[in-house]
């Protein structure tokens, strides 16, 4: 319906009034963002990134040397191979970056609550345990549909990307999905957040956070590591010595 001249003047005056009122406020207005979803971002030191790249090269040259993870993962990727805890770079990655990152996420979220509202997640009353870790090799046309994970935490570590994956398109990007659909007319614009894969950067997020990976076009491979971890109330229990499978007693597997 066309706006009449009188309605146009009235709307213009209201807009001017609101603008002037905002400029003359003696007490500032505050916008409160409700129900935040926290995602932790970090970066690996260069020597560790290089060690993991060398491990990825070795694994992909002889894929059968590591268990195939694709049968229990959601991704439609060229290769998905489980990594063992005794392989080069795996323990430093877990102990110095992934589990500390999960701990940082817990403290960021839980310490906002009053002490009586923190349940079992008080420091010293729980422990973190890695469930599994695997290598993803994505080529043109491969993708990962929207999915979640089992356990408490999941995450991705970017190792290598082809040059055509850039911020100019969504190709090859990781996407975090919100709980509602995107709808610009009603100001719902933050329901999908895309992350450009940068080698050495990693992201940790709650396992229930829906996410996906877009396909890309052209030559080259996109390498990443992914993991699942769980937070367990109670003090840590002593573990048997020797090599321990990161996949034993896996409660639920969905994939990255």
Give the label of every model feature segment.
Residues 228-256:
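Double-stranded beta-helix
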Residues 27-30, 212-214, 246:
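Karyopherin-beta/Importin-beta family HEAT-repeat alpha-solenoid scaffold
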């Amino acid at each position: 319906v066309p706006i009449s001249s009188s309605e146009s003047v009235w709307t213009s005056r209201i807009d001017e009034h609101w603008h002037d009122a905002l400029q003359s406020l003696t007490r500032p207005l505050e916008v409160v963002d409700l129900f935040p979803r926290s995602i932790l971002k970090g970066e690996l030191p260069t020597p560790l990134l290089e060690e993991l790249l060398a491990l990825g090269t070795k694994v992909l040259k002889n894929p059968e040397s590591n268990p195939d993870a694709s049968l229990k993962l959601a991704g439609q990727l060229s290769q998905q191979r489980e990594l063992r805890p005794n392989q080069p770079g795996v323990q430093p990655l877990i102990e110095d970056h992934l589990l500390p990152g999960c701990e940082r996420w817990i403290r960021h979220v839980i310490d906002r609550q009053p002490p009586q509202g923190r349940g079992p997640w008080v420091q010293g009353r729980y422990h973190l345990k890695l469930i599994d870790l695997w290598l993803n090799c994505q080529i043109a046309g491969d993708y990962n549909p929207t999915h979640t994970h089992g356990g408490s935490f999941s995450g991705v570590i970017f190792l290598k990307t082809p040059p055509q994956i850039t911020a100019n398109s969504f190709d090859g990007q990781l996407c975090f999905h919100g709980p509602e659909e995107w709808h610009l007319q009603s100001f719902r614009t933050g329901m999908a957040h895309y992350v450009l894969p940068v080698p050495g950067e990693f992201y940790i997020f709650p396992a229930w956070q829906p996410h996906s990976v877009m396909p890309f076009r052209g030559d080259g491979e996109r390498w990443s590591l992914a993991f699942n971890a769980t937070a367990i109330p109670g003090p840590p229990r002593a573990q048997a010595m020797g090599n321990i499978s990161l996949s034993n007693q896996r409660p639920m597997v969905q994939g990255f």
